[in-house]
């Protein structure tokens, strides 16, 4: 392939100064900027109708801007592949998970409140050292979190859909959670949204956690049952980057009850743009050379 047309959402700034490449901007809401497009780079947030719009252009690849692809229909038009943004967001999301965990474990909300009121007030907090942390989900994001937890001298219990042994030790299964949760000082949720994980963090899950334990959610909002979070927010410390719904209504009780709410910004760092740039250039290069696309999660 010598001539490639790529349509890119204005959410991204991609450097594609490559001979034979035509780069067009497309908001994916208006008609496509060309009759034929080879590769479409989606905005941060995708909707099911976006796939149909892209398919009408004869595109070979829809490159998502997210790791998750739960909003994409599984019955794709023939010839269209969907790739996620694995390698783009894992590090940044793990950073936010660690920041949220430390914020809650060191009671930094308390320190901030004292600062605003100009009070010098010392206190002790739980901290992370010697604590037990359950990590639910050990995919790209979960593994990145596990790597960052290692220097903090914690006991990390890893949990995934399927229990197994790997090079790092035991991975417990979701079915082990009822026995594991009461032991945890903190639980970090980093699973994809699937049929088996939707509403996983429900009343039963939260009831099994001990008082003052920390729950960090950097997965998807629908992994947790919102009413259950509200019900347990007075005895648990909730640090949520994702919620259901998003955005939360401004009068939602979680704003007051949660220890920390961040507006789904797990991947939002400058590194995201550099890494997305590298990924798109890789996809274009593979298309030109006839190599398979990388990160394909749906389609051919």
Describe the role of every protein-language-model region.
Residues 162-253:
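Rossmann-like adenosine-cofactor binding region
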Residues 94-110, 151-152, 277-286, 291:
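Oxidoreductase and adenylate-handling cofactor-binding alpha/beta cores
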